[in-house]
Amino acid sequence: MSRYVFTSESVTEGHPDKICDQVSDAVLDALLAQDPSSRVACETVVNTGLCMITGEVTSKAQVDFIHLVRNVIKEIGYSGARAGGFDANSCAVLVALDQQSPDIAQGVNEADDHAGDPLDLVGAGDQGIMFGYACNETPELMPLPISLAHRLSRRLAEVRHNGTLGYLLPDGKTQVSVVYENDKPVSIDTILISTQHTAEVDGISDEQGIRERITEDLWTHVVEPATADLALKPSREATKYLVNPTGKFVVGGPQGDAGLTGRKIIVDTYGGYARHGGGAFSGKDPTKVDRSAAYAARYVAKCLVAAGLAERAEVQLSYAIGVAKPVSILVESFGTSALANDALTALVQEHFDLRPGAIIETFGLRNLPQQRGGCFYQDTAAYGHFGRNDLNAPWEDVTAKSQELKQVAAA
């Protein structure tokens, strides 16, 4: 019997790197909502009293970027008396956006391998490799460690926003360690929560007292509600439970650490449980295969698992800049499928169109911000891009396609 512990982490929307992801995706949303053909590559950096957006944009949209940035920061919770050294109302906002390189635009606008099919006209925005993954550990077909970590971080933000724990501040992280036996989760080994808080907590000012109060409050208001519907639950007796191990966490957010777009790519995906091609998502329009092809790879993997063709599936895609068709497609089932990996790969090649133009059209990626009231990608930028029931993301809707695959495999 094999036994091991696997750990994944999540961060709250107030983590400095996640502020940047949300700002970059808010810029993307605003541009696509007005002009769905916008080309966007927006990077954000934050530090004490500063937020800068930079990158390349080609769009007909007219956006007040400074107002937009301040609104995002305020929504997260950095404003007013408790904002510390990073206040939406007073921080410096710098905008340094250029146009997309004509050399890159040329390859995206007209693919090198087009042959009359309109979907062949959209070439990949860059070379690269992307991975998608799914497994049957959770109803959303995600690995349990990252699923639990996201549940905790989202609940941590929720009790801050609704005032249940009024002493909480925006910055926070969670980490969950799960025990596996024969590749199946059997128990929760450790839960770690680090959360920013006010200097005094409900009138308590000594460090030990603050830590004890937060520890009890988080178990009652975060851990228990976040895991209440799970068959595999943590317990105070059996699960190691750590809260703010350094003792206190008062200085946080961009005042404590600088943040950058794209530095939480493992949090954004599968918590390290599957491979990652290295490309970040936020701030990138759908012609960037770092984003759109990663969504497609998740869709393919989830379809295979939902169809019962594998218990675990990892899909690798690769692209060349300016070329529409993938350079390679590979499926790995880790021995959990009755079909060989090459047979699964052939099935994917036959039944999924993975050209960038087809991915954009299948999921409606250019029009999602417009259809969702001007905000879609910003919502993906915290708490993961996959396994999210709240987003109604098109790459998570596999009902029809998985049934099609099941019928094909049974024939």
From Swiss-Prot:
<feature type="binding site" description="in other chain">
    <location>
        <position position="100"/>
    </location>
    <ligand>
        <name>L-methionine</name>
    </ligand>
</feature>
<feature type="binding site" description="in other chain">
    <location>
        <position position="288"/>
    </location>
    <ligand>
        <name>L-methionine</name>
    </ligand>
</feature>
<feature type="binding site" description="in other chain">
    <location>
        <begin position="263"/>
        <end position="264"/>
    </location>
    <ligand>
        <name>ATP</name>
    </ligand>
</feature>
<keyword id="KW-0963">Cytoplasm</keyword>
<dbReference type="GO" id="GO:0006730">
    <property type="term" value="P:one-carbon metabolic process"/>
</dbReference>
<dbReference type="InterPro" id="IPR022630">
    <property type="entry name" value="S-AdoMet_synt_C"/>
</dbReference>
<dbReference type="GO" id="GO:0006556">
    <property type="term" value="P:S-adenosylmethionine biosynthetic process"/>
</dbReference>
<feature type="region of interest" description="Flexible loop">
    <location>
        <begin position="100"/>
        <end position="110"/>
    </location>
</feature>
<dbReference type="GO" id="GO:0004478">
    <property type="term" value="F:methionine adenosyltransferase activity"/>
</dbReference>
<comment type="subunit">
    <text>Homotetramer; dimer of dimers.</text>
</comment>
<feature type="binding site">
    <location>
        <position position="17"/>
    </location>
    <ligand>
        <name>Mg(2+)</name>
    </ligand>
</feature>
<feature type="binding site">
    <location>
        <position position="257"/>
    </location>
    <ligand>
        <name>L-methionine</name>
    </ligand>
</feature>
<dbReference type="Pfam" id="PF02772">
    <property type="entry name" value="S-AdoMet_synt_M"/>
</dbReference>
<keyword id="KW-0547">Nucleotide-binding</keyword>
<dbReference type="InterPro" id="IPR022631">
    <property type="entry name" value="ADOMET_SYNTHASE_CS"/>
</dbReference>
<protein>
    <recommendedName>
        <fullName>S-adenosylmethionine synthase</fullName>
        <ecNumber>2.5.1.6</ecNumber>
    </recommendedName>
</protein>
<dbReference type="GO" id="GO:0005524">
    <property type="term" value="F:ATP binding"/>
</dbReference>
<dbReference type="InterPro" id="IPR022636">
    <property type="entry name" value="S-AdoMet_synthetase_sfam"/>
</dbReference>
<feature type="binding site">
    <location>
        <position position="280"/>
    </location>
    <ligand>
        <name>ATP</name>
    </ligand>
</feature>
<keyword id="KW-0067">ATP-binding</keyword>
<feature type="binding site">
    <location>
        <position position="284"/>
    </location>
    <ligand>
        <name>ATP</name>
    </ligand>
</feature>
<dbReference type="GO" id="GO:0000287">
    <property type="term" value="F:magnesium ion binding"/>
</dbReference>
<dbReference type="Pfam" id="PF02773">
    <property type="entry name" value="S-AdoMet_synt_C"/>
</dbReference>
<dbReference type="Pfam" id="PF00438">
    <property type="entry name" value="S-AdoMet_synt_N"/>
</dbReference>
<dbReference type="InterPro" id="IPR002133">
    <property type="entry name" value="S-AdoMet_synthetase"/>
</dbReference>
<feature type="binding site" description="in other chain">
    <location>
        <begin position="248"/>
        <end position="249"/>
    </location>
    <ligand>
        <name>ATP</name>
    </ligand>
</feature>
<dbReference type="GO" id="GO:0005737">
    <property type="term" value="C:cytoplasm"/>
</dbReference>
<comment type="pathway">
    <text>Amino-acid biosynthesis; S-adenosyl-L-methionine biosynthesis; S-adenosyl-L-methionine from L-methionine: step 1/1.</text>
</comment>
<comment type="function">
    <text>Catalyzes the formation of S-adenosylmethionine (AdoMet) from methionine and ATP. The overall synthetic reaction is composed of two sequential steps, AdoMet formation and the subsequent tripolyphosphate hydrolysis which occurs prior to release of AdoMet from the enzyme.</text>
</comment>
<feature type="binding site" description="in other chain">
    <location>
        <begin position="171"/>
        <end position="173"/>
    </location>
    <ligand>
        <name>ATP</name>
    </ligand>
</feature>
<dbReference type="InterPro" id="IPR022629">
    <property type="entry name" value="S-AdoMet_synt_central"/>
</dbReference>
<feature type="binding site">
    <location>
        <position position="43"/>
    </location>
    <ligand>
        <name>K(+)</name>
    </ligand>
</feature>
<feature type="binding site" description="in other chain">
    <location>
        <position position="15"/>
    </location>
    <ligand>
        <name>ATP</name>
    </ligand>
</feature>
<feature type="binding site" description="in other chain">
    <location>
        <position position="56"/>
    </location>
    <ligand>
        <name>L-methionine</name>
    </ligand>
</feature>
<keyword id="KW-0460">Magnesium</keyword>
<keyword id="KW-0630">Potassium</keyword>
<feature type="binding site">
    <location>
        <position position="257"/>
    </location>
    <ligand>
        <name>ATP</name>
    </ligand>
</feature>
<keyword id="KW-0808">Transferase</keyword>
<keyword id="KW-0554">One-carbon metabolism</keyword>
<keyword id="KW-0479">Metal-binding</keyword>
<comment type="similarity">
    <text>Belongs to the AdoMet synthase family.</text>
</comment>
<dbReference type="InterPro" id="IPR022628">
    <property type="entry name" value="S-AdoMet_synt_N"/>
</dbReference>
